[in-house]
């Protein structure tokens, strides 16, 4: 039997009585954001909206994005990454569990020196994939060209944010590369590994 999202008390500044809000709403008010599912347009828009709203509310308080995601759609993932670069507060990224595919791309997009992985977290990077294998030839060629552009974008970002040479990142993106937290730190995807 599912229990749903737990409710916790929250007292707004200036109010005497606390109201009950879901735990994520309460955590958002503390600037703690969660990416705990596959990336699609809906979750991307929710996170973007929260980051922009919290940035407008107070541009001096940093944001924390906790990631446990198998990855997902490329364009919505890039939109999250771009928003992280756009908002004024620094965005800390924290990998707990798994940051795979676009999840690792978002993880590497945190403020440099403020990217963290839990000790048993896993990170996986690879090139973008397409789901259009039954398309007409003309559509497939256009899709392949777009995929190459996206791959170039992702590769460039990994190179800039990890400090790895282009040839290393390009070669690694040819396949699924899984890393432990310490391996992700050595690669430059995260800066710190939390202690056990």
Curated annotation (Swiss-Prot):
Component of the chloroplastic Clp protease core complex. Keywords: Chloroplast, Hydrolase, Plastid, Protease, Serine protease. Gene3D superfamilies: 2-enoyl-CoA Hydratase, Chain A, domain 1. It comes from the Eukaryota. The lineage of its organism: Eukaryota, Viridiplantae, Streptophyta, Embryophyta, Tracheophyta. This is ATP-dependent Clp protease proteolytic subunit. Its EC number is 3.4.21.92. It is found in: Plastid, Chloroplast stroma. One of its GO terms (biological process) is protein quality control for misfolded or incompletely synthesized proteins. The active site is at 101 (nucleophile), 126.
């Amino acid at each position: 039997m599912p229990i749903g999202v737990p409710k916790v008390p929250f007292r707004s500044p200036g109010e005497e009585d606390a109201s009950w809000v879901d735990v994520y709403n309460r955590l958002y008010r503390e600037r703690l954001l969660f990416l705990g599912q596959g990336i699609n347009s809906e979750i991307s828009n929710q996170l973007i909206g929260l980051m922009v709203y919290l940035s407008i509310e107070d541009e001096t308080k940093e944001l924390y994005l906790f990631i446990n995601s198998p990855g997902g759609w490329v364009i919505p993932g890039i939109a999250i990454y771009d928003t992280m670069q756009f908002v004024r507060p620094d965005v800390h990224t924290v990998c707990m569990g798994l940051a795979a595919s676009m999840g690792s791309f978002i993880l590497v997009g945190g403020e440099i020196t403020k990217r963290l992985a839990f000790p048993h977290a896993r990170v996986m990077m690879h090139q973008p994939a397409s789901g259009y294998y039954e398309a007409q030839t003309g559509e497939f060629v256009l899709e392949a060209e777009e995929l190459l552009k996206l791959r170039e974008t992702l590769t460039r970002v990994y190179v800039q944010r990890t400090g790895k040479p282009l040839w290393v990142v390009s070669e690694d993106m040819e396949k699924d590369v899984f890393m432990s937290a310490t391996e992700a730190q050595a690669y430059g995807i995260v800066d710190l590994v939390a202690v056990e």
